[in-house]
Amino acid sequence: MHERLRIVIVGAPGYTGAELAAALASHPGAELVGLFGSDRRSSTGTAPELLSDLFPRLAGVVDLPVRAADTASILACDPDAVFLATPHEASEALAPALLAAGAVVFDLSAAFRLRDASLYPKHYGFEHGHAALLSEAVYGLPEVAGDALRTASLVACPGCYPTSVILPVRPLVAAGIVDRSRPVIVDSASGVSGAGRSAAVKSLFCEVSLQPYGVLAHRHQPEMAQETGARILFTPHLVALDRGILSTIHAELAP
């Protein structure tokens, strides 16, 4: 382990990756040694784009190039830790080799959040090929995992909506305050950046209205249920905001 932790971010050009890069760049114990984007960022004979070219606010803060992601290039950076801000299937494919090479992996996708591999086809659209890692992954909320995070090799960072629900609901369930025979009802509102940085008409600001989506079938519901121990009825809403989440939670008290 190096004196300053050598950090690689895969998925740096996305909103989450850029926020992470900015935070780590100012951390005294971290050194950013590699930024990677899609594996489609193949060389064209020109210099790779800098992250600050994609996010001008990071000029002078994170001026590293963003290169095409592949396992060999990532490991060539000699990282102590790798953050995967990548799609679920990409994280599931990359993590095993990185772990085998001795890197600590922080996965920001949902690829290792659920302990039951059979839930992935229904909620995330792919068969999980590394089910054994699901029992090894440590859920990345300190309020849930506690000291287990100190020695974890694979950290499954929590989802956005689940974080807003688990933090208030889990302690109430554990204390016996909530009636577990009744569902906990969650109405959440999220800003548009939660949909990612890819161009899409539905994400254009003038196209955004207050609207529910994923009603009774949102992929974050099983994660909430797993980590709270409660039955969850969850309805998310898209609102015309840049960022942020507001969750209004209704629960019946135990008799």
Give the positions of each predicted feature.
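Charged docking surfaces used in two-component/phosphorelay signaling
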Residues: 194-255
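N-terminal Rossmann-like NAD(P) cofactor-binding subdomain of oxidoreductases
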Residues: 1-213
